């Protein structure tokens, strides 16, 4: 009988705590769900400063300019003072004006991932640019990720057989490492990459992800047309 009374008393003491915890979680969820609105205060080329009255978005968050077509995404790169962020535009800033409304998406830039993305070309914000329609992928992943831990990396030294005899003989590639190809214009860097993509797919059954960072549009277009 005494044990039952003690248990009932403990339950009564626990109920206010659970109610307070539930209200705390609800408040946090409501705060996270709230979309922060800001306005553009400066445009300097691809650099756009956005002012927020409250809920300053964290670094690397994606912002979107309201009522703009095509959509323009801004990535937060720096905090300036208490209520202003400096962002980098992921596309052209022509036509932007001071006072234009900006919305915080609440997360970093995310792109589609999965088997549906194989053979597709997308820009940095995950929009398809190969004129083959939308990518029907239900999964997305942020473009920023932590580097894998050293304990998760393989320490075995193994040669990646590329199928290119001059590479495998004179400068073999180590599997799992990084490789740099340096050369002038027109010496065959892109051709070598296309051979690697082809041989990795056919000889090893693997997948290749080609990211054109700072590349000219013509080179990416030529590579795509050659590979299909």
Swiss-Prot record:
E.C. number: 7.1.2.2
Gene3D superfamilies the record matches: 2.40.10.170, P-loop containing nucleotide triphosphate hydrolases
Pfam families membership: ATP-synt_ab (PF00006), ATP-synt_ab_N (PF02874)
GO biological process per UniProt: proton motive force-driven mitochondrial ATP synthesis
Annotated organelle transit peptide span: 1-31
Enzyme category, top tier: translocase
GO terms for cellular component: mitochondrial inner membrane; proton-transporting ATP synthase complex
A GO molecular-function annotation: ATP binding
Superkingdom, taxonomy of origin: Eukaryota
Subcellular location per the Swiss-Prot or TrEMBL entry: Mitochondrion; Mitochondrion inner membrane
Keywords: ATP synthesis, ATP-binding, CF(1), Hydrogen ion transport, Ion transport, Membrane, Mitochondrion, Mitochondrion inner membrane, Nucleotide-binding, Transit peptide, Translocase, Transport
UniProt binding sites for ATP: 183-190
Major subcellular site: mitochondrion
Bilayer-spanning residue ranges: none
Catalytically driven reaction(s): ATP + H2O + 4 H(+)(in) = ADP + phosphate + 5 H(+)(out)
Key word Translocase present: yes
Quaternary structure annotation from Swiss-Prot or TrEMBL: F-type ATPases have 2 components, CF(1) - the catalytic core - and CF(0) - the membrane proton channel. CF(1) has five subunits: alpha(3), beta(3), gamma(1), delta(1), epsilon(1). CF(0) has three main subunits: a, b and c.
Protein task: Mitochondrial membrane ATP synthase (F(1)F(0) ATP synthase or Complex V) produces ATP from ADP in the presence of a proton gradient across the membrane which is generated by electron transport complexes of the respiratory chain. F-type ATPases consist of two structural domains, F(1) - containing the extramembraneous catalytic core, and F(0) - containing the membrane proton channel, linked together by a central stalk and a peripheral stalk. During catalysis, ATP synthesis in the catalytic domain of F(1) is coupled via a rotary mechanism of the central stalk subunits to proton translocation.
UniProt cross-references to PANTHER family, sorted A to Z: ATP SYNTHASE (PTHR15184), ATP SYNTHASE SUBUNIT BETA, MITOCHONDRIAL (PTHR15184:SF71)
Similarity remark: Belongs to the ATPase alpha/beta chains family.
Protein name per UniProt: ATP synthase subunit beta, mitochondrial
Gene of this entry: ATPsynbeta
């Amino acid at each position: 009988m005494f044990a039952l009374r003690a248990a009932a008393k403990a339950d009564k003491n626990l109920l206010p705590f659970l109610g307070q915890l539930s209200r705390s979680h609800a408040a946090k969820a409501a705060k996270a769900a709230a979309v922060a609105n800001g306005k553009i205060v400066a445009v300097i080329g691809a650099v756009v400063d956005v002012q927020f009255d409250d809920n300053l978005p964290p670094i690397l968050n994606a912002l979107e300019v309201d009522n703009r077509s095509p959509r323009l995404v801004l990535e937060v790169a720096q905090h300036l003072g208490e209520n202003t962020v400096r962002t980098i535009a992921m596309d052209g800033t022509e036509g932007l004006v001071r006072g234009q409304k900006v919305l915080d998406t609440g997360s970093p830039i995310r792109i589609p991932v999965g088997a549906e993305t194989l053979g597709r070309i997308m820009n940095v914000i995950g929009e398809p640019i190969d004129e083959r329609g939308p990518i029907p992928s239900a999964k997305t992943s942020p473009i920023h990720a932590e580097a894998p831990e050293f304990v998760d990396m393989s320490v075995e030294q193994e040669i990646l057989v590329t199928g290119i005899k001059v590479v495998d003989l004179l400068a073999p590639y180590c599997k799992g490492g990084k490789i740099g190809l340096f050369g002038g214009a027109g010496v065959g860097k892109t051709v070598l990459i296309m051979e690697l993509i082809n041989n990795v797919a056919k000889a090893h059954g693997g997948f290749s992800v080609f990211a054109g960072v700072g590349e000219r549009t013509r080179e990416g277009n030529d590579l795509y047309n050659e590979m299909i």
